[in-house]
Amino acid sequence: MSPLLRRLLLAVLLQLAPAQAPVSQPDAPGHQKKVVSWIDVYARATCQPREVVVPLNMELMGTVAKQLVPSCVTVQRCGGCCPDDGLECVPTGQHQVRMQILMIQYPSSQLGEMSLEEHSQCECRPKKRESAVKPDRASTPHHRPQPRSVPGWDPAPGAPSPADITHPTPAPGPSAHAAPSAASALTPGPATAAADAAASSVVKGGA
């Protein structure tokens, strides 16, 4: 056998070896487990129109129908993953599709038509950020705060409000250096007591 033929036979055996290897599957013996390739997983998850189930009560806000048959329909809407967290899958092409829906309202029912939106093209675009507009303090006029209302206050016409009523400031109390009171003025001091004693002794000596 020539070396070239040996190499070809070895290559064929290497290719057939993984396919002939036994696969252990307790739940399904004799069946090889199917693995979805990465390219298929990525293609299925990309941003594209896909069939989704939409409840009719969310599409028809304010409908008087008591019951809709069917209660939900399938339409093509954009969905899927974007390569960046700052992007979102949004529709770039849409059209209207009309469907027949049975509207039941006791005791009668009728077959009607309704228009639903379907997406035909999708694209990943930056997410819309809600800009928080803060008012400029310099441009905002300053308003004087209004006085708080007093419970039970019923002002008469022309009467001042409780916030406009001013109370007199109480006079300051006596200080430490204030003049002595009347009681302390009547109390004799040491010099006065000595003069009174001398006067009484003179009176006694003269007697």
Curated annotation (Swiss-Prot):
Highest taxon of the lineage: Eukaryota
Q: Which GO terms describe its cellular component?
A: extracellular space; membrane
Q: Where is the composition biased (Low complexity)?
A: 174-201
Stored CDD domains: PDGF (cd00135)
Q: Which keywords describe this protein according to UniProt? A: Disulfide bond, Glycoprotein, Growth factor, Heparin-binding, Mitogen, Secreted, Signal
Gene3D superfamilies given in the database record = Cystine-knot cytokines
The disulfides recorded in the entry are: C47-C89, C78-C122, C82-C124
Any one Gene Ontology MF annotation carried by this entry is: growth factor activity
Q: Which InterPro entries match?
A: Cystine-knot_cytokine, PD_growth_factor_CS, PDGF/VEGF_dom, PDGF/VEGF_growth_factor
Compositional bias, Basic and acidic residues, is annotated for 124-139
Q: What is its main location?
A: secreted
One Pfam family linked to the record: PDGF
Free-text description of this protein's post-translational modifications in UniProt? VEGF-B186 is O-glycosylated.
- Single Gene Ontology BP term? induction of positive chemotaxis
Q: Where is this region: Disordered?
A: 124-207
Q: How far does the signal peptide extend, from start to end residue?
A: 1-21
Compartments it resides in? Secreted
How it assembles, according to the record, is: Homodimer; disulfide-linked. Can also form heterodimer with VEGF.
PANTHER family, from UniProt? VASCULAR ENDOTHELIAL GROWTH FACTOR, VASCULAR ENDOTHELIAL GROWTH FACTOR B
Summarizing the function annotation, the protein's role is: Growth factor for endothelial cells. VEGF-B167 binds heparin and neuropilin-1 whereas the binding to neuropilin-1 of VEGF-B186 is regulated by proteolysis.
Query: Of which family is this protein a member?
Result: Belongs to the PDGF/VEGF growth factor family.
Give the protein name, as stated in the record: Vascular endothelial growth factor B
The species this protein was found in: Bos taurus (Bovine)
Q: Which gene encodes it?
A: VEGFB
